[in-house]
Amino acid sequence: MRKIFLATAAVALLLSACKQQPAPLSPAETLIQRLDTLQHGPIMYGHQDDPFYGVSWQWEKDRSDTYELVGDYPAVMGFDLGGLEEHHSKNLDSVPFSWIREEAIRHAERGGIITFSWHPRNPRTGGNAWDVTDSTVVRNILENGEQYELFQGWLADV
């Protein structure tokens, strides 16, 4: 009986010493955790369209002014999705969306943070995102507005 008790106690002790693996974090939880850690640290540097063009060059794969200057990529890279709503193959800065996707994935794999902005065309006038010639644009993309359905379609595409 004593041997059974000692064997049971030994197994219980061994099992209690084993750490349970934590559940894997979702990408959102990982980002929140990283941002929480970084908020008390050094300043993070970001660069819009970093791998697509720089001082005296453009559209050269595997280039980055930041990397060439300091030996590391920016902590944050931003990319614009303007043009996606109209199914263009390139964004409003003429960057192919396929490149944006590729570079966003590469930067995430390096541990970087990616931001996306979206500057759609003006749905009221057809002008660019900075066209403010019509003061009714916002009213017209809201529910019951003339461009509501169009804008909802754009949102679904983006």
Model region roles, listed by residue range:
Residues 3, 19-20:
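Surface-exposed charge patches in extracellular/virion surface proteins
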Residues 14-17:
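C-terminal motif of bacterial Sec signal peptides marking the signal peptidase cleavage site
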Residues 82-158:
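Substrate-binding cleft of extracellular glycoside hydrolase catalytic domains
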Residues 2-8:
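Sec-dependent signal peptide recognition
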Residues 20-95, 105:
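N-terminal module-boundary/linker segments of secreted carbohydrate-active enzymes
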